[in-house]
Regions:
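Surface-exposed acidic, glycine/proline-enriched linker/cap segments
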Residues: 138-143, 218-242
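Alpha/beta-hydrolase-fold catalytic nucleophile elbow
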Residues: 174, 199-200, 263
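Alpha/beta-hydrolase-fold serine-hydrolase catalytic core, especially in secreted/extracellular enzymes
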Residues: 1-84, 89-94, 109, 191, ...
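Short hydrophobic alpha-helical runs that function as membrane-insertion/retention elements
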Residues: 124-128, 197, 261-262
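Glycine-rich nucleophile elbow surrounding the catalytic serine of serine-hydrolase chemistry
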Residues: 175-185
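Cap/lid segment of the alpha/beta-hydrolase catalytic domain
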Residues: 94-162, 202-205, 209-211
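Alpha/beta-hydrolase fold nucleophile elbow
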Residues: 166-177
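Hydrolase active-site cap/lid region
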Residues: 184-232
Length: 339
């Protein structure tokens, strides 16, 4: 199925009508893109912490993971918000590229997934985003939950920079479903994140508000069911998505030229795999402008809504491209399914 031919706002046309044709113009246009998309979609941003502390609570060797190192830390950001961060790293003293996941409230990162990550030479860090903001409709939050969860990713990146197990220049963030929305927002708003990956993230994530495939969650659906995720103004565009000054390709473009991977499932219609293709295609123009066309990828697998082992494996394959210089073309050639 091919995405409907509905026009999306032009990423390469500045607000004053000037075409953006040179890489040197992108910084100014990027600022516009951020202001058009992030405050409206996700609401006010949490206060930026001047100092994040990472207090180690426990260090251990994990036999079932071939003597991998495990650190359990308490992360304290802005002096108020605190959450636990667990970091696994392969045995030895080296620092490693790391995959950071905020879905500790779920159990998609099984022992098998973690063992494979460690075997392939990557560290794995995880926190529970609902320690930062509850995922409860009707909750009175000072900011939208997605913004709070993205803030949690940022504070976890702060903490990983204080841990010898991790190379802070090689951090990938990943999340699934609503966690994928948070991971994409985190990567779009923190240039320290080297690779951003959103899995089955749908409306408000890698999907598209204007372009919806059959059975896809709409802007009305998501803002009615989960108003606490978003900024207070977004719901007003339900049924009039054409009037939005942005769509989710804006969020993807904010990641450029850093690496971006979208992973989708062909049968996960609610997550709008058709719309995800459209926002990927539109954001690609910015990556091409910046000479980073091989740093944006989208893959589809058979099956439904899940952070499946195949999705984790695909992420590690792309980590090999970004962090170890493996062939991007070979990666894309192996992942040629389309919606």
């Amino acid at each position: 199925m091919h995405p409907p031919a509905i026009a999306l706002p032009d990423l390469l046309l500045a607000l004053d009508g000037t075409p953006v044709t040179q890489p040197s113009q992108w910084a100014a246009r990027r600022s516009e893109v951020h202001q058009l998309a992030v405050p409206l979609a996700y609401g006010p941003w949490p206060a930026v912490s001047n100092r994040t502390t990472c207090e180690m609570l426990h260090a251990a060797t994990v036999r079932r993971f071939d003597d991998a190192r495990l650190w359990t830390c308490r992360v304290l950001g802005d002096g108020i918000h605190r959450f636990l961060l667990r970091v696994f790293a392969p045995a030895g003293t080296a620092s490693h590229a790391a995959v950071l996941n905020g879905d500790g409230c779920w159990h998609y990162a099984t022992d098998t997934v973690i063992a494979d990550m460690l075997r392939r030479g990557y560290a794995f860090a995880q926190f529970n985003r609902v320690e930062i903001a509850p995922d409860t409709p009707g909750a009175r939050l000072p900011v939208g939950a997605l913004a709070a969860w993205a803030w949690g990713y940022h504070r976890a990146v702060d903490a990983l920079g204080q841990i010898d197990l991790v190379d802070p220049a090689r951090i990938a963030v990943v999340g699934h479903s609503r966690g994928g929305k948070a991971a994409l927002l985190a990567g779009a708003t923190d240039e320290r994140i080297a690779l951003t990956s959103a899995n089955n993230s749908g409306a408000g994530g890698a999907g598209c508000f204007r372009v919806s495939g059959p059975g896809a969650e709409t802007l009305a659906d998501v803002t009615q069911a989960f108003p606490h995720w978003f900024g207070p103004g977004l719901a007003a565009y339900a049924g009039r998505e054409h009037a939005l000054p942005f769509d989710q390709h804006f969020l993807k473009a904010l990641v450029a030229p850093r690496a971006l991977l979208t992973t989708e499932a062909l049968d996960d219609l609610w997550a709008n795999p058709v719309g995800s293709w459209r926002t990927h295609d539109a954001a690609h123009a910015v990556y091409d402008l910046l000479g980073a066309g091989d740093r944006i990828a989208i893959t589809y697998r058979p099956g439904g809504h899940d952070h499946a082992p195949a999705d984790w494996s695909t992420l590690l394959d792309y980590c090999d491209v970004v962090f170890r210089g493996r062939s991007a073309q070979a990666f894309l050639h192996r992942n040629r399914l389309t919606p």
